[in-house]
């Protein structure tokens, strides 16, 4: 059975173009979402994925209607393949029921993996370069060591953690982490 999925990014956009194309392609059922592709919560996609069974074909108007990213798209199509479900994108002329369509997705998978590895490599190189210049990754600490020592002295002098937290605008739980209860009486 051919089952379609349409998605538009906003409620103001119309699904008619995609829906007509899927109906012309022979889709018996069509599920839809009106949400950004970056959103993970897409109820229409969840429903169509539950509905599909071995031998079915998931049909979309265009690749970007299905996946949030190349990596997400490749993972999704691999999951479909593992379940014995084919995938077809009408405007991109991709059909995983054909040898050429399967080959195309193998290439896409390799490209997505390479992209992920390049991102990891660039991130590591950037962090290494920053460390070599004496910079440490992450945001700057909210308090300098001197401020933490002031907090410690207040706690040592019996000031309750709650008061210290209010004075320095820090969570009481942070004070417990930084200065364990066994260290002080408060």
Curated annotation (Swiss-Prot):
Segments of the chain annotated as binding DNA: 161-180
One Pfam family here: Resolvase
GO BP field: DNA integration; symbiont entry into host cell; viral tropism switching
Gene3D superfamilies assigned: Homeodomain-like (1.10.10.60), Resolvase, N-terminal catalytic domain (3.40.50.1390)
Chain's role: Performs inversion of a viral 3 kp segment (C-segment) that encodes two alternate pairs of tail fiber proteins thereby modifying the host specificity of the virus.
Database matches in PANTHER family: DNA-INVERTASE FROM LAMBDOID PROPHAGE, SERINE RECOMBINASE PINE-RELATED
Family named by the database record: Belongs to the site-specific recombinase resolvase family.
Annotated protein name in UniProt: DNA-invertase
